[in-house]
């Protein structure tokens, strides 16, 4: 069975993430959305909140599983017995970092391939960082995220 890992912080999960996951779900038998407990970032939402939102947003996809993880992505990939990682590239500026990361990952676990997908045109400009900033400043981020996520962003802003 072909299993792919789609890692990210998903803080929050956006329509762009959904687009890539939906497309990956057509290419692979199983997609594991790996929500990182990234210690290098200060997320707006807790790991548990991010996992819960992603599960709710992606519930319609029978071959998509959402799980949180901490530590090295390659160790998680090994534990999942997966051999492919999918990453999204929105712009050329994403490529250099992702290319370096893919090379480092390959040096740690040579059996794992990294595949890059570009988002559909209408999602190329969406980033979770920008979505959070729009919401934080009182703007309407609802067209960039699932309604559940938009509601959670609104609730965060009120606090």
UniProtKB/Swiss-Prot annotation:
Its cofactor is Mg(2+). Substrate binds at residues 9, 41, 73, 87. GO terms for molecular function: ATP binding; pantetheine-phosphate adenylyltransferase activity. GO terms for cellular component: cytoplasm. GO terms for biological process: coenzyme A biosynthetic process. It catalyses: (R)-4'-phosphopantetheine + ATP + H(+) = 3'-dephospho-CoA + diphosphate. The record marks 17 as: Transition state stabilizer. Gene3D superfamilies: HUPs. InterPro entries: Cyt_trans-like, PPAT, Rossmann-like_a/b/a_fold. Its main location: cytoplasm. It is found in: Cytoplasm. Reversibly transfers an adenylyl group from ATP to 4'-phosphopantetheine, yielding dephospho-CoA (dPCoA) and pyrophosphate. Homohexamer. HAMAP family: PPAT_bact. Belongs to the bacterial CoaD family. This is Phosphopantetheine adenylyltransferase. It comes from Nitrosomonas europaea (strain ATCC 19718 / CIP 103999 / KCTC 2705 / NBRC 14298). The gene is coaD.
């Amino acid at each position: 069975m072909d299993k792919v890992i789609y890692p990210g912080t998903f803080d929050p999960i956006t329509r762009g993430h959904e687009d890539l996951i939906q497309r990956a779900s057509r290419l692979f038998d199983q997609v594991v959305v790996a929500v990182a407990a990234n210690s290098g970032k200060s997320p707006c939402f807790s790991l548990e909140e991010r996992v819960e939102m992603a599960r709710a947003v992606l519930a319609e996809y029978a071959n998509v599983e959402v799980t949180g993880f901490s530590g090295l992505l390659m160790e998680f990939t090994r534990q999942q017995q997966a051999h492919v990682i999918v990453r999204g590239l929105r712009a050329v500026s994403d490529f250099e970092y992702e290319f370096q990361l893919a090379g480092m990952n390959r040096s740690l676990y040579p059996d794992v391939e990294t595949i890059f997908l570009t988002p559909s045109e209408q999602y190329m400009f969406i980033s979770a960082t920008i979505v959070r900033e729009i919401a934080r400043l009182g703007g309407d981020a609802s067209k960039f995220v699932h309604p559940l996520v938009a509601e959670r962003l609104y609730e965060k802003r009120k606090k």
